[in-house]
Amino acid sequence: MHKKVLSFILCFALMTSGCLEGSTPDMDGDGIQDSEDLDIDGDGWSNSEELNCTSDPNDGEVTPIDTDGDSQCDPNDLDDDGDSWSDAEEGRCGTDPVDSESVPDDLDGDMECDEWDDDSDGDDLPNEWELERGFDPMDPNDFISCHGEAKYCLRTYDDFTFAETHNAYSTIEDQVLVGVNHYTGLQRQWDDGIRAFMVDSHHSHYDHTSKEDVRFCHSTGQFFHPCNFGEVDALEWMRMLNSLMNNSSGDVVTLLIENYVPASHLSFLFNETGMKDRIYTHTLGDEWPSLGDLVIHGKNLIVFWEQSQHDEYPWLHDFGTFGWTTNYAESSKDEMTCTVHRGDGSQPVWHLNNWLSSIYGLPDPILANDVNEYETLLNRSLQCWEEMDNRPTFVAVDYWEEGEVTNVTITLNKMSHWSDEVPEHP
């Protein structure tokens, strides 16, 4: 009887202590029962990760393959070896996607392997373009720059915008007295980025009409010789331009000549100053060449004149046949338009004339400051680009020092279309 009582007490104690209850499964011994444990086998990989990686979540000795140790198993890792090149990229480039020491050749570091990179050396010139022109597409130091940027060398002449000075020679610095268009002469204009120049060619006097007597000057009325109130020796001016071009690289220059001398005298002027060999001759109807090709071939000067085409001098391009201009010398901004005033509006090369005249018909620095102001000139250029569906090739101004014509052209040249986001002010 006494033994039965003791047995009963012992069983009761065991039952109330829970010692006879069934044990809860906990494979990894982390104190979390398996039914609630996100990593049953305690191998550092969650159950779902192991299932996705075709690994056994119930075996702590079996873990997913993870070559680069980024806790992303290789079957689901876009970059198995962790070398920053995706497996797909390495496969395309012919390197081992599970060997971090095997990486694609990438000369310019743009994460596009050289084999598939159109610009392997990262100099903004396509490999094929460089090869065709004798440059090394694998040497970032072997390149050409046009107007300060290699990428502009790919642009055609008519797909670039040049700052242009109207009556470029008519300056206070050059001691012109009446009808002054600018404060400073050619050197300052060049230094600030002007690369297109409108000039007027006359003989120095009615009695001096030899080829050596060509001057740049312009008339202020019908009663006086055009050079009475100031002139610039055309030979000296052109020699300076030639020197500036010789000491520069990658610049394409344009002259628009309002001409009043024989074509043979202009030919003498260009020959005597060493400029003749620079001149590019365009064939009407052909596409304009790229800036790069003009520079490479040493034909980086384009000359237009305001006369009919001359068969003996085909390099003197009739501006009205090879291009067109807007109106000019209006009295107010409200009168300015974008439409064709002179020339063939179907041609891609054109001049956006942007200067006003005073009530006396003369250039006016105050009016120039108004229309050359950055936002004003930029907005007009974009408006005309949109309206004519063609970027202005030239933006021509009086008193270039007033306002920011060169900064406007810098901004325009950063854009491929008028609807692009406008870049920040240079």
Please report, for each region that a protein language model flagged, where it lies by residue.
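Catalytic cores of phosphodiester-bond hydrolases, prominently lipid phosphodiesterases
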Residues: 144-426
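Secretory-pathway extracellular proteins and peptide precursors enriched for disulfide-bonded cysteines
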Residues: 11, 45-49, 63-65, 85-89, ...
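Extracellular calcium-associated, cysteine-rich motifs in secreted modular proteins
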Residues: 19-147
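Secretory targeting signatures
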Residues: 1-29
